[in-house]
């Protein structure tokens, strides 16, 4: 589980919220697969609406140009982002994301390796509505500032708790990673982040940094699937 700080600025969030307020919304259960439909109770912006498609494309572009997301997920394919809304009493019970997803209006499918939530509501705007992810270390609760995101393995059992006050708006998407194995992907992320931190510190011999870069990229060559 990795937090991405300010993938969207406050101004971006305001623009997204304004446009989403003018878009049609429907019952989120219509897009749920299998057992997830029975525990899903939220609303989802109409993915076919022109404004929703435009926002989704803008977010796709932002994902691709955010180095920390690229490092953490090593995305090969990205599902078009969806926008969901939880009003008071609405929730999404424990579920696991579908392993295979078909991209709407295409014949293309992706394997969901990495899930991402981008928060579009400030924490003080609503009570409840925490994203809860079951991990080997217990339940992890996430409630981040608007514009922040969290990425986590799609294999994780997770839920969104009931909103008891206000409204929770977020964007969600899924990625097929070039590295399917979650442990290997996390190790590559840690290595890359260590290299980036050494570069920022500016006190490491250039030859050593070149060697580390060489190791990282050769591991990428060895383990990625395209």
Curated annotation (Swiss-Prot):
Keywords of the record: Dioxygenase, Iron, Metal-binding, Oxidoreductase, Vitamin C
EC number from the UniProt entry: 1.14.11.-
GO MF annotations, alphabetized: 2-oxoglutarate-dependent dioxygenase activity; iron ion binding; L-ascorbic acid binding
Record's keyword annotation contains Iron: yes
Endpoints of the signal sequence: none
PROSITE patterns: FE2OG_OXY
Cofactor binding summary note: Binds 1 Fe(2+) ion per subunit.
All residue ranges annotated as the Fe2OG dioxygenase domain in the record: 77-177
Name of the protein in its database record: PKHD-type hydroxylase Sfri_0612
């Amino acid at each position: 589980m990795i937090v991405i700080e300010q993938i969207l600025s406050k101004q971006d969030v305001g623009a997204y919220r304004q446009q989403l307020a003018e878009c049609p919304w429907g019952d989120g259960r219509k897009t749920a697969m299998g057992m997830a439909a029975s525990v899903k109770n939220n609303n989802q912006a109409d993915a076919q609406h022109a404004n929703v498609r435009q926002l989704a494309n803008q977010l796709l572009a932002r994902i691709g140009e955010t180095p920390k997301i690229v490092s953490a997920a090593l995305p090969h394919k990205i599902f078009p982002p969806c926008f969901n809304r939880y009003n008071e009493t609405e929730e999404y019970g424990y579920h696991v994301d579908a392993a295979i997803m078909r991209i709407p209006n295409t014949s293309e499918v992706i394997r969901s390796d990495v899930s991402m939530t981008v928060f579009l509501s400030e924490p003080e705007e609503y009570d409840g509505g925490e994203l809860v992810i079951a991990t080997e270390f217990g339940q992890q609760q996430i409630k981040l500032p608007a514009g922040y995101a969290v990425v986590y393995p799609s294999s994780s059992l997770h839920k969104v708790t009931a909103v008891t006050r206000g409204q929770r708006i977020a964007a969600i998407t899924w990625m097929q990673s070039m590295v399917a194995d979650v442990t290997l992907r996390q190790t590559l992320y840690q290595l890359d982040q260590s290299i980036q931190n050494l570069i920022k510190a500016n006190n490491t011999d250039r030859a050593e940094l070149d060697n580390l870069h060489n190791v990282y990229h050769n591991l990428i060559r060895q383990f990625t699937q395209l």
